Amino acid sequence: MLPFIVKLHIRNTSLGDLSWLPESMNRRADFFLYGKNVVLFVIAVIMILNIIDRILIRNEKAGNVKYLLPLCGYGITVILSTIFSKSKDVALRGMIEQYEGMWILLAYVIVAIYSYIIVQSEKDMECICMTMLTAGILQSVFGIAEILGGEILSTSLFRNIIVGQQYKELAGHMVFGFMGESYQRVSGTLYNSNYAGIYFAMILLLGIFLFVKWDGKKRIYAAVASVLSLICLIGSGSKSAILCMLAVMIWCAAEALFRKQRKQVLYLLAASAVIGCGYFIYDSVFGVHTIQRITESLDLQEKTDKLTDIRVLKDHISIIWDGETYALCMEKEGKSLYPHVFAKDGSELELVSDEKRQICWPETMEGQDIYLQCYYKDGVPYMAVFHNDIRWLFTDVVDDRYTYINIWGKPDEVISAPSVGFKGKEHWFTDRGYIWSRTIPLLKNKILVGSGPDTFMLQFPQNDYVARAAQGYGFFSEIITKPHCMYLQIAVQTGVLSLVFFLCLPIGSGIKYRRNRYRNLKKDGEKQKDHTYVDGIECLIIFYLLTGITNDSMVVLAPLYWVLLGVFMKNVKPALDKVRPVF
């Protein structure tokens, strides 16, 4: 139910007061996250009451609670990070474009504990798997409609439901879709095409697993869910989803070979062939060029920009261009303004003018994509430096010194943020190299506790303008709201210690499960038995953790992971009446 919730919520943020944000950020609309946030919190409260009823009233066993200790440790670090946060309101309620405040992170913990306690049998796990397939099929209806050029959420019925009575006048002006794309990407009700891709890849992996395990009508159901999920996965255009899914399938094939399960290897090879054909056909029909998009994002060549530094000083602007330092200033003569450029030794550079475009440039920088312009606007003198389709605007009327005016028209400081690694490689993985290199230095003061849940945007050096400009105008004008890495997200916001607890959960459970499994194999004379649904759940957990390298935790997907993690930690061992190998 949770992934399907879409509801308009308009929030007053007061963020527009920050120098690096536009005034429009004071009031923001949300459709896909806040509603899910509220419903998840209500579900978590119901789960707590159910747990109390089962354990304290009915005296049911909760299982070995020692396996929940890392989970409790994670929850404690979340609470402590909120208590010590400088932005407590954000840490409690969450930030726009994320809405993962303390209450939601604790709700994830409750979801995992509930799954750990409640799931008792193979029948329970079959119910979870069947529910996931059904949800995947329903979600694919939205996705296939988008591929065919429609948008279910944009129909008048859904628009009126989404906005409600309070904002009904907005219903006729709403259109859902991705702007600036050459083709319609699938996102469904999952906020973003990347998260939609991850979701459909999880359903596809589960469908392949269940197709091998199930018989009869249930096998057909798994096949239908797999095919529909594959179509929507391809339509999402998510690069990380397909790459991580292929990595998991290779891992499964290697393990099947190790266990001498040739039949499972053939199933995986057949599934890989179908996936490959699906991408080839889709690319041919829609001209998407998936392979090209993947290789472009994996372009590992170093890239550098000639403009590497800007310092705004009292009486001039200092820039480093192609390794050389220059001083820029403007001279006022009556109603006219004249730019001047000086070399490091104090000599003035000759300027070449283009009267038609009213720009000029140093003669020694002819054809190097750097131009100067001075002008008055509303009586205020400005000097603009143009490079790489970006305008750097300066004035000298603020506090009687030179000041940078950012693209939002606000005076701001230009800083050079500390970085670790990725020098010349900031463009790697769709500019994630830059974000990661500026995020890692933030960790040194966040070992025990972090800055608070959902406060990454307030911690990131948003005014590291020069380094961002080197990645192009699109990235330069973007507000960095998340690190695009779940592990950095956790470490910054709730502390490195919380990341250790977070990783202890799947890694510790995985080691325990594999140790028990191979011990049983040895006892049975290396005869492979059906390991029920736990193998499939393990694959989904590994897949989700892999996608976390380049994606963040989001309320649209995270609850599903925590459900699976709780089940996996319980490591259910039902009676095995049927022997049927599963990869």
Question: Locations of the language-model features?
Answer:
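TM-adjacent membrane-interface loops and short helices in multi-pass inner/ER membrane proteins
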Residues: 151, 192, 323-325, 329-331, ...
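Juxtamembrane membrane-water interface segments that cap and precede transmembrane helices
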Residues: 14-33, 90-91, 172-189, 434, ...
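Interfacial/capping segments of alpha-helical transmembrane domains
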Residues: 9-21, 152-164, 450, 460
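Long, low-complexity, polar/charged, intrinsically disordered or flexibly structured peripheral segments
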Residues: 350, 355-427, 442
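Non-cytosolic membrane-interface motifs at loop->transmembrane helix junctions
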Residues: 92-102
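Alpha-helical transmembrane segments of multi-pass inner-membrane proteins
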Residues: 1-7, 36-53, 66, 70-88, ...
